[in-house]
Amino acid sequence: MAQINENYLKLPGSYLFSEIARRVNEFKVQNPDADIIRLGIGDVTRPLAPVVVEAMKQAVEEMGRAETFRGYGPEQGYDFLIEKIIANDYAPRGVQLGMDEVFVSDGAKSDTANFQEIFGVDNIMAVTDPVYPVYVDSNVMAGRTGNYDIEKGQYGRIIYLPCTEEGDMKPELPTAPVDMIYLCFPNNPTGMTLTKEELKVWVDYARENKAIILFDSAYEAFIREEGVPRSIYEVEGAREVAVEFRSFSKTAGFTGTRCAYTVVPKDIMIYDSTGEGHSLNKLWLRRQTTKFNGVSYPVQAGAAAVYTEEGKKQIQATIDYYMENARIIREGLQEAGFKVFGGVNAPYIWMKTPGTMGSWEFFDKLMTEAHVVGTPGAGFGANGEGFFRLTAFGTRENTEKAIERIKARMK
Protein backbone atom coordinates (compact mmCIF):
# COMPACT_ATOMS: atom_id res chain seq x y z
CA MET A 1 0.00 0.00 0.00
CA ALA A 2 1.48 3.32 -1.09
CA GLN A 3 1.48 5.86 1.72
CA ILE A 4 1.63 9.62 1.46
CA ASN A 5 3.90 12.13 3.09
CA GLU A 6 1.35 13.13 5.71
CA ASN A 7 2.85 16.60 6.03
CA TYR A 8 0.95 17.43 2.85
CA LEU A 9 -2.26 16.96 4.80
CA LYS A 10 -1.23 19.89 7.01
CA LEU A 11 -1.39 22.32 4.09
CA PRO A 12 -4.33 24.70 3.68
CA GLY A 13 -7.13 23.34 1.52
CA SER A 14 -6.01 25.30 -1.55
CA TYR A 15 -3.23 27.61 -2.63
CA LEU A 16 -4.22 31.26 -2.12
CA PHE A 17 -4.34 32.18 -5.79
CA SER A 18 -6.25 29.03 -6.69
CA GLU A 19 -8.98 30.07 -4.27
CA ILE A 20 -9.06 33.54 -5.80
CA ALA A 21 -9.40 32.04 -9.28
CA ARG A 22 -12.24 29.81 -8.08
CA ARG A 23 -14.19 32.76 -6.67
CA VAL A 24 -13.62 34.87 -9.77
CA ASN A 25 -14.73 32.07 -12.09
CA GLU A 26 -17.84 31.49 -10.00
CA PHE A 27 -18.69 35.20 -10.16
CA LYS A 28 -18.16 35.31 -13.94
CA VAL A 29 -20.51 32.38 -14.46
CA GLN A 30 -23.19 34.28 -12.57
CA ASN A 31 -22.28 37.62 -14.18
CA PRO A 32 -21.04 36.86 -17.71
CA ASP A 33 -21.09 40.51 -18.80
CA ALA A 34 -18.98 41.78 -15.90
CA ASP A 35 -15.70 43.42 -16.98
CA ILE A 36 -13.34 42.06 -14.34
CA ILE A 37 -10.04 43.88 -13.84
CA ARG A 38 -7.40 41.76 -12.12
CA LEU A 39 -4.96 43.57 -9.87
CA GLY A 40 -4.33 40.52 -7.74
CA ILE A 41 -1.82 37.85 -8.71
CA GLY A 42 1.59 39.29 -9.48
CA ASP A 43 1.90 38.33 -13.14
CA VAL A 44 3.24 40.90 -15.57
CA THR A 45 1.55 42.31 -18.67
CA ARG A 46 4.36 44.05 -20.58
CA PRO A 47 6.08 41.93 -23.26
CA LEU A 48 9.69 40.87 -23.24
CA ALA A 49 12.08 43.63 -24.25
CA PRO A 50 12.96 43.59 -27.98
CA VAL A 51 16.65 43.03 -27.20
CA VAL A 52 15.73 39.95 -25.15
CA VAL A 53 13.55 38.58 -27.94
CA GLU A 54 16.32 39.05 -30.50
CA ALA A 55 18.87 37.33 -28.26
CA MET A 56 16.56 34.38 -27.75
CA LYS A 57 15.84 34.13 -31.49
CA GLN A 58 19.56 34.05 -32.22
CA ALA A 59 20.10 31.41 -29.54
CA VAL A 60 17.33 29.23 -30.97
CA GLU A 61 18.88 29.54 -34.43
CA GLU A 62 22.20 28.43 -32.94
CA MET A 63 20.43 25.39 -31.52
CA GLY A 64 19.22 24.58 -35.02
CA ARG A 65 22.72 24.30 -36.48
CA ALA A 66 24.97 21.32 -35.80
CA GLU A 67 28.09 23.46 -35.39
CA THR A 68 26.51 25.68 -32.71
CA PHE A 69 24.06 23.24 -31.09
CA ARG A 70 24.26 22.89 -27.30
CA GLY A 71 23.01 19.95 -25.26
CA TYR A 72 22.93 19.83 -21.50
CA GLY A 73 24.34 23.02 -20.07
CA PRO A 74 26.06 23.52 -16.71
CA GLU A 75 23.60 23.02 -13.85
CA GLN A 76 24.83 26.20 -12.19
CA GLY A 77 24.33 28.34 -15.30
CA TYR A 78 26.42 29.47 -18.25
CA ASP A 79 29.46 31.60 -17.45
CA PHE A 80 28.36 34.31 -19.89
CA LEU A 81 25.25 35.02 -17.77
CA ILE A 82 26.90 34.65 -14.36
CA GLU A 83 29.64 37.09 -15.39
CA LYS A 84 27.03 39.70 -16.35
CA ILE A 85 25.07 39.17 -13.14
CA ILE A 86 28.13 39.80 -10.99
CA ALA A 87 29.40 42.72 -13.08
CA ASN A 88 26.05 44.53 -13.22
CA ASP A 89 24.04 43.58 -10.13
CA TYR A 90 26.77 43.37 -7.51
CA ALA A 91 30.14 44.90 -8.43
CA PRO A 92 28.73 48.45 -8.82
CA ARG A 93 27.46 48.22 -5.23
CA GLY A 94 30.82 47.15 -3.88
CA VAL A 95 29.85 43.48 -3.55
CA GLN A 96 32.44 40.96 -4.68
CA LEU A 97 31.22 37.50 -5.68
CA GLY A 98 32.91 34.45 -7.13
CA MET A 99 31.58 32.75 -10.25
CA ASP A 100 30.83 29.65 -8.19
CA GLU A 101 28.66 31.60 -5.75
CA VAL A 102 25.88 32.35 -8.27
CA PHE A 103 23.39 29.65 -9.28
CA VAL A 104 21.11 30.31 -12.26
CA SER A 105 17.68 28.69 -11.91
CA ASP A 106 14.17 28.61 -13.34
CA GLY A 107 12.63 30.88 -10.71
CA ALA A 108 12.87 32.40 -7.25
CA LYS A 109 9.69 30.56 -6.28
CA SER A 110 11.27 27.16 -6.83
CA ASP A 111 14.56 28.22 -5.23
CA THR A 112 12.97 29.66 -2.08
CA ALA A 113 10.85 26.52 -1.82
CA ASN A 114 13.70 24.10 -2.50
CA PHE A 115 16.43 25.66 -0.42
CA GLN A 116 14.93 24.45 2.85
CA GLU A 117 15.75 20.86 1.81
CA ILE A 118 19.31 21.38 3.04
CA PHE A 119 18.18 22.21 6.58
CA GLY A 120 17.42 19.60 9.24
CA VAL A 121 13.77 19.06 10.05
CA ASP A 122 14.28 20.26 13.64
CA ASN A 123 15.49 23.72 12.64
CA ILE A 124 13.34 26.54 14.00
CA MET A 125 12.22 28.91 11.27
CA ALA A 126 11.00 32.49 11.47
CA VAL A 127 8.85 34.28 8.91
CA THR A 128 7.35 37.72 8.75
CA ASP A 129 3.56 37.83 9.07
CA PRO A 130 2.14 38.60 6.52
CA VAL A 131 4.38 36.48 4.31
CA TYR A 132 4.68 35.07 0.79
CA PRO A 133 2.93 31.67 1.23
CA VAL A 134 5.62 29.60 -0.51
CA TYR A 135 8.10 30.03 2.36
CA VAL A 136 5.64 28.48 4.80
CA ASP A 137 4.06 25.84 2.57
CA SER A 138 7.39 24.36 1.44
CA ASN A 139 8.44 23.93 5.07
CA VAL A 140 5.08 22.37 5.90
CA MET A 141 5.73 19.78 3.20
CA ALA A 142 9.11 19.04 4.79
CA GLY A 143 7.61 18.47 8.24
CA ARG A 144 9.34 21.39 9.91
CA THR A 145 6.35 23.51 10.98
CA GLY A 146 4.24 21.42 13.34
CA ASN A 147 0.46 21.34 13.11
CA TYR A 148 -1.81 24.12 11.92
CA ASP A 149 -3.88 25.98 14.50
CA ILE A 150 -7.06 26.96 12.67
CA GLU A 151 -8.09 29.53 15.27
CA LYS A 152 -4.72 31.31 15.23
CA GLY A 153 -4.14 30.76 11.52
CA GLN A 154 -0.57 29.71 12.32
CA TYR A 155 1.66 26.63 12.57
CA GLY A 156 2.87 25.54 15.98
CA ARG A 157 6.63 25.39 15.29
CA ILE A 158 7.02 28.56 13.23
CA ILE A 159 8.15 31.78 14.89
CA TYR A 160 5.99 34.52 13.38
CA LEU A 161 7.32 38.07 13.21
CA PRO A 162 4.32 40.42 13.06
CA CYS A 163 4.41 43.31 10.60
CA THR A 164 1.81 45.70 11.96
CA GLU A 165 0.37 49.07 11.09
CA GLU A 166 1.82 50.45 14.33
CA GLY A 167 5.28 49.13 13.43
CA ASP A 168 5.14 50.53 9.89
CA MET A 169 4.96 46.97 8.54
CA LYS A 170 8.52 46.19 9.64
CA PRO A 171 9.34 43.06 11.67
CA GLU A 172 11.19 43.02 14.97
CA LEU A 173 13.84 40.47 15.91
CA PRO A 174 12.57 37.16 17.30
CA THR A 175 12.61 36.96 21.08
CA ALA A 176 13.68 33.30 20.99
CA PRO A 177 16.62 31.79 19.05
CA VAL A 178 15.83 30.69 15.50
CA ASP A 179 17.87 28.92 12.84
CA MET A 180 16.25 29.97 9.55
CA ILE A 181 14.99 33.50 8.88
CA TYR A 182 12.94 34.31 5.78
CA LEU A 183 13.07 37.98 4.81
CA CYS A 184 11.72 39.60 1.64
CA PHE A 185 12.57 43.23 0.86
CA PRO A 186 11.18 45.07 -0.99
CA ASN A 187 8.42 43.10 0.63
CA ASN A 188 5.73 40.99 -0.93
CA PRO A 189 2.94 41.63 0.04
CA THR A 190 3.38 44.93 1.94
CA GLY A 191 5.65 46.73 -0.53
CA MET A 192 7.80 48.06 2.33
CA THR A 193 11.60 48.20 2.54
CA LEU A 194 14.35 48.25 5.18
CA THR A 195 17.22 50.70 5.43
CA LYS A 196 20.78 49.43 5.50
CA GLU A 197 20.90 50.10 9.24
CA GLU A 198 17.70 48.14 9.82
CA LEU A 199 18.98 45.24 7.73
CA LYS A 200 22.25 45.22 9.66
CA VAL A 201 20.29 44.42 12.84
CA TRP A 202 19.17 41.17 11.20
CA VAL A 203 22.63 40.30 9.92
CA ASP A 204 24.11 40.89 13.37
CA TYR A 205 21.43 38.69 14.94
CA ALA A 206 22.13 35.88 12.47
CA ARG A 207 25.87 36.07 13.10
CA GLU A 208 25.39 35.95 16.86
CA ASN A 209 23.00 32.99 16.69
CA LYS A 210 24.57 31.04 13.80
CA ALA A 211 21.29 31.45 11.95
CA ILE A 212 20.90 31.73 8.18
CA ILE A 213 18.89 34.46 6.47
CA LEU A 214 17.02 33.43 3.33
CA PHE A 215 16.71 36.84 1.67
CA ASP A 216 14.23 37.21 -1.19
CA SER A 217 15.31 40.22 -3.24
CA ALA A 218 13.13 39.56 -6.28
CA TYR A 219 11.86 43.14 -6.40
CA GLU A 220 15.09 45.09 -5.91
CA ALA A 221 14.89 46.61 -9.41
CA PHE A 222 11.80 48.56 -8.34
CA ILE A 223 13.61 50.49 -5.60
CA ARG A 224 13.42 54.23 -6.30
CA GLU A 225 14.65 55.88 -3.10
CA GLU A 226 18.27 56.48 -2.15
CA GLY A 227 19.55 54.71 0.94
CA VAL A 228 17.55 51.53 0.39
CA PRO A 229 19.91 48.55 -0.08
CA ARG A 230 19.38 46.49 -3.21
CA SER A 231 21.32 43.53 -1.85
CA ILE A 232 21.76 42.19 1.65
CA TYR A 233 25.47 41.85 0.84
CA GLU A 234 25.78 45.63 1.08
CA VAL A 235 25.67 44.97 4.84
CA GLU A 236 28.95 44.02 6.50
CA GLY A 237 29.02 40.37 7.54
CA ALA A 238 26.09 39.28 5.39
CA ARG A 239 28.30 36.95 3.34
CA GLU A 240 28.62 34.79 6.45
CA VAL A 241 24.89 34.32 7.05
CA ALA A 242 22.72 35.25 4.05
CA VAL A 243 21.52 33.52 0.90
CA GLU A 244 20.00 35.91 -1.66
CA PHE A 245 17.30 35.03 -4.20
CA ARG A 246 16.71 37.15 -7.30
CA SER A 247 14.55 36.82 -10.38
CA PHE A 248 14.16 38.11 -13.93
CA SER A 249 10.40 37.49 -13.72
CA LYS A 250 9.18 40.91 -12.63
CA THR A 251 12.34 42.81 -13.56
CA ALA A 252 12.37 41.71 -17.20
CA GLY A 253 9.00 40.03 -17.79
CA PHE A 254 10.28 36.44 -17.51
CA THR A 255 7.24 35.05 -15.67
CA GLY A 256 6.45 32.85 -18.67
CA THR A 257 10.07 32.33 -19.68
CA ARG A 258 11.54 31.36 -16.28
CA CYS A 259 14.95 32.54 -15.20
CA ALA A 260 16.33 33.58 -11.83
CA TYR A 261 19.42 33.14 -9.71
CA THR A 262 20.45 32.47 -6.14
CA VAL A 263 23.63 33.67 -4.47
CA VAL A 264 25.21 31.32 -1.91
CA PRO A 265 28.48 32.76 -0.56
CA LYS A 266 31.19 30.24 0.29
CA ASP A 267 31.57 31.88 3.71
CA ILE A 268 28.28 30.42 4.99
CA MET A 269 28.54 27.36 7.20
CA ILE A 270 25.75 25.03 8.30
CA TYR A 271 26.29 22.58 11.15
CA ASP A 272 25.71 18.87 11.75
CA SER A 273 24.64 17.26 15.03
CA THR A 274 28.23 17.17 16.30
CA GLY A 275 28.71 20.89 15.70
CA GLU A 276 30.98 20.41 12.71
CA GLY A 277 30.52 23.08 10.03
CA HIS A 278 29.83 22.33 6.36
CA SER A 279 29.84 24.60 3.32
CA LEU A 280 26.29 25.60 2.40
CA ASN A 281 27.53 26.50 -1.07
CA LYS A 282 28.81 22.98 -1.68
CA LEU A 283 25.61 21.42 -0.38
CA TRP A 284 23.42 23.58 -2.63
CA LEU A 285 25.64 22.71 -5.60
CA ARG A 286 25.25 19.02 -4.72
CA ARG A 287 21.49 19.42 -4.50
CA GLN A 288 21.26 21.26 -7.82
CA THR A 289 23.45 18.83 -9.73
CA THR A 290 21.25 15.99 -8.47
CA LYS A 291 17.82 17.52 -9.07
CA PHE A 292 18.24 20.21 -11.74
CA ASN A 293 19.58 20.17 -15.28
CA GLY A 294 19.91 23.90 -15.70
CA VAL A 295 17.97 26.63 -17.48
CA SER A 296 17.76 26.35 -21.26
CA TYR A 297 20.39 28.08 -23.36
CA PRO A 298 17.96 30.38 -25.24
CA VAL A 299 16.45 31.60 -21.96
CA GLN A 300 19.87 32.33 -20.44
CA ALA A 301 20.86 34.14 -23.64
CA GLY A 302 17.75 36.28 -23.26
CA ALA A 303 18.57 36.99 -19.62
CA ALA A 304 22.11 38.03 -20.54
CA ALA A 305 20.69 40.54 -23.04
CA VAL A 306 19.03 42.33 -20.12
CA TYR A 307 22.50 43.59 -19.17
CA THR A 308 23.39 45.16 -22.53
CA GLU A 309 23.16 48.95 -22.76
CA GLU A 310 20.03 48.74 -24.88
CA GLY A 311 18.65 46.03 -22.64
CA LYS A 312 19.07 48.20 -19.55
CA LYS A 313 17.18 51.05 -21.23
CA GLN A 314 14.33 48.81 -22.35
CA ILE A 315 14.01 47.08 -18.98
CA GLN A 316 14.07 50.39 -17.12
CA ALA A 317 11.25 51.67 -19.32
CA THR A 318 9.15 48.67 -18.30
CA ILE A 319 9.94 49.14 -14.62
CA ASP A 320 9.06 52.83 -14.89
CA TYR A 321 5.75 51.84 -16.48
CA TYR A 322 4.84 49.57 -13.58
CA MET A 323 5.96 52.07 -10.97
CA GLU A 324 3.78 54.74 -12.55
CA ASN A 325 0.93 52.26 -12.15
CA ALA A 326 1.94 51.91 -8.51
CA ARG A 327 1.79 55.68 -8.06
CA ILE A 328 -1.66 55.81 -9.65
CA ILE A 329 -2.93 53.07 -7.35
CA ARG A 330 -1.33 54.45 -4.20
CA GLU A 331 -2.44 58.04 -4.71
CA GLY A 332 -5.90 57.01 -5.93
CA LEU A 333 -6.51 54.89 -2.85
CA GLN A 334 -5.31 57.70 -0.61
CA GLU A 335 -7.71 60.09 -2.35
CA ALA A 336 -10.49 57.58 -1.71
CA GLY A 337 -9.65 57.64 2.00
CA PHE A 338 -7.80 54.34 2.34
CA LYS A 339 -4.64 53.94 4.41
CA VAL A 340 -1.91 52.43 2.24
CA PHE A 341 1.62 51.08 2.55
CA GLY A 342 4.17 50.33 -0.17
CA GLY A 343 4.01 51.32 -3.82
CA VAL A 344 7.10 53.56 -3.56
CA ASN A 345 9.96 51.05 -3.84
CA ALA A 346 7.88 48.04 -4.86
CA PRO A 347 5.09 47.16 -7.29
CA TYR A 348 2.81 46.16 -4.40
CA ILE A 349 0.33 48.35 -2.56
CA TRP A 350 -0.90 47.13 0.83
CA MET A 351 -4.16 48.80 1.82
CA LYS A 352 -6.16 48.69 5.02
CA THR A 353 -9.73 47.49 4.58
CA PRO A 354 -12.54 49.83 5.71
CA GLY A 355 -13.56 49.69 9.37
CA THR A 356 -13.59 46.16 10.72
CA MET A 357 -14.16 44.52 7.35
CA GLY A 358 -12.29 41.25 6.86
CA SER A 359 -9.95 40.66 3.93
CA TRP A 360 -12.11 38.10 2.14
CA GLU A 361 -15.23 40.14 2.83
CA PHE A 362 -13.54 43.11 1.16
CA PHE A 363 -12.43 40.86 -1.72
CA ASP A 364 -16.04 39.89 -2.41
CA LYS A 365 -17.28 43.46 -2.05
CA LEU A 366 -14.61 44.85 -4.38
CA MET A 367 -15.30 42.16 -6.97
CA THR A 368 -19.09 42.43 -6.88
CA GLU A 369 -19.38 46.22 -6.64
CA ALA A 370 -16.33 47.49 -8.57
CA HIS A 371 -15.50 44.38 -10.61
CA VAL A 372 -11.89 44.65 -9.44
CA VAL A 373 -9.94 41.66 -8.11
CA GLY A 374 -7.09 41.94 -5.62
CA THR A 375 -5.56 39.63 -3.02
CA PRO A 376 -6.97 39.29 0.51
CA GLY A 377 -4.31 40.01 3.11
CA ALA A 378 -5.47 37.07 5.22
CA GLY A 379 -4.06 34.80 2.51
CA PHE A 380 -0.58 35.95 3.53
CA GLY A 381 -0.98 35.13 7.21
CA ALA A 382 -2.94 35.98 10.33
CA ASN A 383 -1.50 39.50 10.50
CA GLY A 384 -2.69 40.14 6.95
CA GLU A 385 -6.29 40.06 8.13
CA GLY A 386 -7.87 43.46 7.63
CA PHE A 387 -5.54 44.31 4.75
CA PHE A 388 -5.60 43.85 0.98
CA ARG A 389 -2.92 43.73 -1.73
CA LEU A 390 -3.10 45.35 -5.15
CA THR A 391 -0.33 45.05 -7.73
CA ALA A 392 1.03 47.44 -10.34
CA PHE A 393 1.55 44.81 -13.04
CA GLY A 394 -1.65 45.52 -14.97
CA THR A 395 -1.97 47.64 -18.07
CA ARG A 396 -2.15 51.42 -17.65
CA GLU A 397 -5.70 51.46 -19.00
CA ASN A 398 -6.91 48.80 -16.57
CA THR A 399 -5.04 50.34 -13.65
CA GLU A 400 -6.62 53.74 -14.20
CA LYS A 401 -10.04 52.22 -14.78
CA ALA A 402 -9.81 50.09 -11.63
CA ILE A 403 -8.87 53.03 -9.43
CA GLU A 404 -11.67 55.19 -10.85
CA ARG A 405 -14.12 52.39 -10.08
CA ILE A 406 -12.82 52.04 -6.52
CA LYS A 407 -13.04 55.79 -5.94
CA ALA A 408 -16.57 55.91 -7.33
CA ARG A 409 -18.07 52.73 -5.87
CA MET A 410 -16.20 51.90 -2.67
CA LYS A 411 -16.68 55.03 -0.58
From Swiss-Prot:
GO terms for biological process: lysine biosynthetic process via diaminopimelate, diaminopimelate-aminotransferase pathway. The lineage of its organism: Bacteria, Bacillati, Bacillota, Clostridia, Eubacteriales. Its cofactor is pyridoxal 5'-phosphate. PANTHER family: AMINOTRANSFERASE (PTHR43144). Keywords: Aminotransferase, Pyridoxal phosphate, Transferase. Pathway: Amino-acid biosynthesis; L-lysine biosynthesis via DAP pathway; LL-2,6-diaminopimelate from (S)-tetrahydrodipicolinate (aminotransferase route): step 1/1. Belongs to the class-I pyridoxal-phosphate-dependent aminotransferase family. LL-diaminopimelate aminotransferase subfamily. Its EC number is 2.6.1.83. This is LL-diaminopimelate aminotransferase. It comes from the Bacteria. The modification N6-(pyridoxal phosphate)lysine is found at K250. Homodimer. Substrate binds at Y15, G42, K109, Y132, N188, N293, R389. GO terms for molecular function: L,L-diaminopimelate aminotransferase activity; pyridoxal phosphate binding. It catalyses: (2S,6S)-2,6-diaminopimelate + 2-oxoglutarate = (S)-2,3,4,5-tetrahydrodipicolinate + L-glutamate + H2O + H(+). Involved in the synthesis of meso-diaminopimelate (m-DAP or DL-DAP), required for both lysine and peptidoglycan biosynthesis. Catalyzes the direct conversion of tetrahydrodipicolinate to LL-diaminopimelate. Pyridoxal 5'-phosphate binds at Y72, A108, K109, Y132, N188, Y219, S247, F248, S249, R258, N293.
